[in-house]
């Protein structure tokens, strides 16, 4: 009896998670989508309406630029910082790590927007993609640096020591030994950074004023009519397109690395 109740509870929980996904998959192809699940007349008209909206198309391009740039910069910076904190011993290292994790967890979200707005305005970076990328990188760097530090800690130092004995410089050790061994961890944080940047709404909504610079997370508001009522067909189609880059990136990285956290010795 207990097993049957557990099975029913798990099925109900699975259905609760599956229904929104099923709606997202079916609603874009429905001529007149509702909040329920139905697919009476399959059509591509909703996608046609999305690509006719210049703000929506520009938003997708902006999101790709912002997310890719942030992913590349933050991944490299987090890896190099993690390697330094993992391998180098210097005074105050633990204090710096503690302050970074404290600030990244306490000063975030809405509480950080007012000082960020004032800072970007004083630097002349308000309403610019460069300023937004810098904010993204600064916000995502501490957490991903800690993830990478744990990964670098698991890599045996003997590889680097052997390279130094063979005459390699510290820079060569970093580029030829450390970075290749860190690739699985870098892939993991790259996906995390891309997803966080791609899905962020609050930061670009506040720091960007020009509609032509808005990412897709903000541009979706163009599918609300004059009185604020959502146009379900277009929103569903846009949301479907919006998920494709993230899912594609996850599949590529998962097939190549499998999100296995290993160091120098593969398991």
Positions of predicted regions on the chain:
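A hydrophobic, multi-pass inner-membrane permease signature
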Residues: 1-267
């Amino acid at each position: 009896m207990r097993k049957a109740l557990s099975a029913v509870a798990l099925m109900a929980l699975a259905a609760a998670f599956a229904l929104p996904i099923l709606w997202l998959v079916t609603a874009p192809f429905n001529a007149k989508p509702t909040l329920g699940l139905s697919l009476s007349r399959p059509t591509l008209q909703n996608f046609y309406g999305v690509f006719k909206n210049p703000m929506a198309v520009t938003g997708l391009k902006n999101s790709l630029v912002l997310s890719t740039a942030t992913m590349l910069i933050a991944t490299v910076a987090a890896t190099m910082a993690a390697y330094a904190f993992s391998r180098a011993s210097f005074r105050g290292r633990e204090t710096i790590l503690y302050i970074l994790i404290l600030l990244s967890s306490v000063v975030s979200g809405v509480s950080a927007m007012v000082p960020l707005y004032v800072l970007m305005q004083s630097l002349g970076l308000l309403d610019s993609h460069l300023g937004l990328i810098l904010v993204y990188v600064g916000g995502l760097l501490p957490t991903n640096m800690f993830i990478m530090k744990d990964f670098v800690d698991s890599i045996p130092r003997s590889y680097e020591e052997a390279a130094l004995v063979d005459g390699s410089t510290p820079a060569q050790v970093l580029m030829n030994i450390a970075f290749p061994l860190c690739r699985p961890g870098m892939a993991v944080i790259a996906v995390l950074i891309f997803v966080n940047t791609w899905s962020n709404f609050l930061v670009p909504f506040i720091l960007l004023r020009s509609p032509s610079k808005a990412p897709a997370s903000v541009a979706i508001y163009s599918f609300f009519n004059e009185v604020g009522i959502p146009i379900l067909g277009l929103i569903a189609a846009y949301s479907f397109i919006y998920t494709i880059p993230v899912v594609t990136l996850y599949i590529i990285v998962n097939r190549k690395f499998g999100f296995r956290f290993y160091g120098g010795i593969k398991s």
